[in-house]
Amino acid sequence: MILKQKFFNRPALKVTEDLLGKFLVRKIGNKEVALMITEVEAYDGFQDKASHAHRGKTKRNEVMFSEAGRFYIYLIYGFHNMLNIVTGKKNYPAAILIRGAGDISGPGRLTKFLKIGRHFNNKKANRKSGLWIEDRGIKISKRNIKRTPRIGVNYAGKIWAKKPYRFFLKQKKLNFQFPICKLLSSFVFSVIIY
C-alpha cells in the first residue's frame, strides 16, 4: 500500500521511527525497484539548529514549509543528492533524511543507485512522480530500533548535535515472508525488481 499524505502529516520524530521497515520504490523505465528503509534522520522545525530551516525560509529549503509527503532533494559536496520527505503541518518545516535502504548505506549512495536527482524536488511521493514509499505489512519491533545522534551535524552546537534523531535497524538480517513479491535474496534488505 502506497503511503498517503496522512501518514506524513504527523510529528517528524513519530514518522521517522515509523518509516523503518517501509519500502522506498523507484520506477525506472518499465521496472520498479523497491528497497526496505533501514536508516533515517529527523530534522524538526525552526528550533532544530541542524535543520536547513533553522534560519527561516529560503529558495533552497522552501519545500520544507509545504505540505507533508513531498520530497526535498538537495545537493552536498557538489555531487551527492540527499533524499528527504517533508512531514508535519504546512508552514512547520520538518523533513526526514533517508540515509539507508536495502543493502545500501549512505544517502548519497542511495540516490545514485536509484537515479534520484533534483528533478524530484517538491514532487509528491506517488506513482505519478515515479518515486514513492510503501507499507508492505512489516512490523519492526522497538527492540530492533537504535537511536543515536545524527551524522555530521556538529555545526548545530552541543545540544542539537547530540539529539538522538537518527533511527536505524540494529539487526540487518530479518526473516519476513512476502506472499506477493519475489525476493532476489533470502533477506528483505535486498533489491526487489518486478
Predicted regions and their residues:
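Conserved, well-structured core segments that form or line functional sites
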Residues: 1-176
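Short, basic, low-complexity termini and linkers enriched in Ser/Thr/Gly/Pro
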Residues: 138, 173-194
